[in-house]
């Protein structure tokens, strides 16, 4: 008997709906990354994308512990000399709350083409509305 290897064509990918309201950012991101990789499935294969599609709603109501709202900083560089832009977690949640979850999850996925493919299956929305009703996502309680 040989070791089982999942094939990209035969992998069953489901759609799940996750409500981020009141969830801790890091704990939620860890579970989302695990499910995007497919590590919760018995057919998990490291070099094949076996993960599911995840629709996250209420990103604006995510919770953090301690003083991270003021202390946690996000940095981005515009490409021009001296233009390193910095904003706190509180400012980031005001401007673009969905990006906070996306950045946290992206850092937990593999770097490279396979990780980018897994990341594309994550859909994050600030409010309760999302355009994926046609996929009939199942509610996932994390």
Curated annotation (Swiss-Prot):
Subunit: Part of the 50S ribosomal subunit.
InterPro entries per record: Ribosomal_uL13, Ribosomal_uL13_bac-type, Ribosomal_uL13_CS, Ribosomal_uL13_sf
Signal peptide extent: none
Name of the protein: Large ribosomal subunit protein uL13
Chain's gene name: rplM
Pfam assignment, any one: Ribosomal_L13
PROSITE patterns: RIBOSOMAL_L13
Similarity comment text for this entry: Belongs to the universal ribosomal protein uL13 family.
GO terms, molecular function: mRNA binding; structural constituent of ribosome
PANTHER family: LARGE RIBOSOMAL SUBUNIT PROTEIN UL13M, RIBOSOMAL PROTEIN L13
Gene Ontology cellular component annotations, sorted alphabetically: cytosolic large ribosomal subunit
Keyword Endoplasmic reticulum: no
Function: This protein is one of the early assembly proteins of the 50S ribosomal subunit, although it is not seen to bind rRNA by itself. It is important during the early stages of 50S assembly.
Keywords, sorted A to Z: Ribonucleoprotein, Ribosomal protein
Keyword Ribosomal protein tagged: yes
Organism: Stenotrophomonas maltophilia (strain K279a)
One GO biological process term: negative regulation of translation
């Amino acid at each position: 008997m040989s070791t089982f290897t999942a094939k990209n064509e035969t992998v069953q990918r489901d759609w799940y709906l996750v409500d981020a309201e009141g969830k801790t950012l890091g704990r939620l991101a860890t579970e989302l990354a695990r499910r995007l990789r497919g590590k919760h499935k018995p057919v998990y294969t490291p070099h094949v994308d076996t993960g599911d599609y995840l629709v996250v709603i209420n990103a604006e109501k995510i919770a953090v512990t301690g003083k991270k709202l003021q202390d946690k900083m996000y940095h981005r560089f515009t490409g021009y000399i001296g233009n390193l832009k910095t904003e706190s977690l509180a400012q980031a949640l005001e401007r673009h709350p969905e990006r906070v979850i996306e950045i946290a999850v992206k850092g937990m996925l593999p770097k490279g083409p396979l990780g980018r493919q897994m990341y594309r299956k994550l859909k994050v929305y600030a409010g309760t509305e999302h355009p994926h009703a046609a996929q009939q996502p199942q509610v996932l309680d994390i």
